[in-house]
């Protein structure tokens, strides 16, 4: 809605063709983080946090929408224009998680594999459902009414939107809260509740986050200086 198409596509190519494979090889390519015992079964850090760090860098360089933040720092609501379509998209994503998360087991040839996938399916559904319920309760307590967009983000996993707004970062689709924040939590949770080591998990989060964020910030800044990344004010409005 405020970014030029071609600079965005250039960044997508660099992210998927350069940044993502490098940090992915550190874990899934038997790299140094894998040797340390860092655990990321389905991509909490390698997929979700990576996208979140890249989105954070882009949002900082791009700047907020016109009128999003007032002169005194107040946040002006700018709700989406098609909530039914957003709701449909959330449920499509919810359904797709079963293939994405379950498929990370990479095998279905034994009872142990089937049992592991069943646990993944149950946890996936419970996590999304719990996210919706918590978002409904929290928005009712905080805003005196339920907010559909935050409830949808709750299913994906994010209630950090108010914090992002306070930092004056305009994240239209909630990518930072839903993917970055929850990706970090998902990775730490392995060290807290699972078989991973909390220190190793933290090292992985920091190292991958620093690499992706700094690299993305450099790429976005170069695109901004060379070809420009923001549409003119008339097109934005």
Language-model regions, residue ranges each:
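Hydrophobic alpha-helical transmembrane bundles of multi-pass membrane proteins
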Residues: 1-237
């Amino acid at each position: 809605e405020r970014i030029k198409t071609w600079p965005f596509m250039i960044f997508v190519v660099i992210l998927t063709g350069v940044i993502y494979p490098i940090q992915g090889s550190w874990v899934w390519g038997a790299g140094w983080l894998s040797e340390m015992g860092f655990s990321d079964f389905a991509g909490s850090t390698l997929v979700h946090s990576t996208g979140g760090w890249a989105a954070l860098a882009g949002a900082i360089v791009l700047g907020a929408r016109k009128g999003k933040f007032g002169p005194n720092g107040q946040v002006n609501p700018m709700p989406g224009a098609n909530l039914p379509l957003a709701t449909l998209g959330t449920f499509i994503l919810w359904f797709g998680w079963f293939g994405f998360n379950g498929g990370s087991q990479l095998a279905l040839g034994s009872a142990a594999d089937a049992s592991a996938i069943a646990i993944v399916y149950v946890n996936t559904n419970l996590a999304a459902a719990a996210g919706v319920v918590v978002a409904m309760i929290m928005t009712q307590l905080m805003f005196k009414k339920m907010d559909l967009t935050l409830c949808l983000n709750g299913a994906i996993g994010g209630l950090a939107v108010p914090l992002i707004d306070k930092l004056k970062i305009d994240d239209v689709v909630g990518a930072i809260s839903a993917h970055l924040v929850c990706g970090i939590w998902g990775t730490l949770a392995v060290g807290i509740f699972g078989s991973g080591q909390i220190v190793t998990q933290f090292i992985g989060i920091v190292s991958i986050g620093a690499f992706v964020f700094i690299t993305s910030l450099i790429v976005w800044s170069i695109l901004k200086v060379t070809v420009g990344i923001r549409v003119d004010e008339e097109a934005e409005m």
